[in-house]
């Protein structure tokens, strides 16, 4: 679920940036998404959005699905059995790892999405 995703982000980035910093970034980080991603980090969010969309098509509810995971050496790893829990966990873990690698550009936080995300 979204709280677990926030915790995964903290695991992957070693707590260097609050999870909420990603909630309103670029065109895809946060609710919804459209247009061309503004940078590598925004592409991570677009991929995560697409993963959640695939989960929804499988009958899962990714924002609410509770799964089992652990933080091992700054890498989130999923422990859930196959099915919705494992699928959603994999979406979140991949995104958290992607966020940790991508540069965070303050100028892409809280942008005017109506102008920049066409």
Curated annotation (Swiss-Prot):
Record: active site: 48, 92
Name listed for the protein in its UniProt record: Basic phospholipase A2 PA-12C
GO molecular function, one term: calcium ion binding
Binding site for Ca(2+): 28, 30, 32, 49
Catalytically driven reaction(s): a 1,2-diacyl-sn-glycero-3-phosphocholine + H2O = a 1-acyl-sn-glycero-3-phosphocholine + a fatty acid + H(+)
The family this protein is said to belong to: Belongs to the phospholipase A2 family. Group I subfamily. D49 sub-subfamily.
Disulphides: 11-71, 27-117, 29-45, 44-98, 51-91, 60-84, 78-89
Organism annotation: Pseudechis australis
Cofactor(s) of this protein: Ca(2+)
Protein localization: Secreted
Keywords associated with the record: Calcium, Disulfide bond, Hydrolase, Lipid degradation, Lipid metabolism, Metal-binding, Secreted
SUPFAM superfamilies hit by this protein: Phospholipase A2, PLA2 (SSF48619)
Its EC number(s): 3.1.1.4
GO biological process: arachidonate secretion; lipid catabolic process; phospholipid metabolic process
């Amino acid at each position: 679920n979204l709280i677990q995703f926030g915790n995964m982000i903290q695991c992957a980035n070693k707590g260097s940036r609050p999870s909420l910093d990603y909630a309103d970034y670029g065109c895809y980080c946060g609710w919804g998404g459209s247009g061309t991603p503004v940078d590598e980090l925004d592409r991570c969010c677009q991929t995560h959005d697409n993963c959640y969309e695939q989960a929804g098509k499988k009958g899962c509810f990714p924002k609410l699905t509770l799964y089992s995971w652990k933080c091992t050496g700054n890498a989130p790893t999923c422990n859930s059995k196959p099915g919705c829990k494992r699928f959603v966990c994999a979406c979140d873990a991949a995104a958290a790892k992607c966020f940790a690698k991508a540069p965070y550009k303050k100028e892409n936080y809280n942008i005017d999405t109506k102008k920049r995300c066409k």
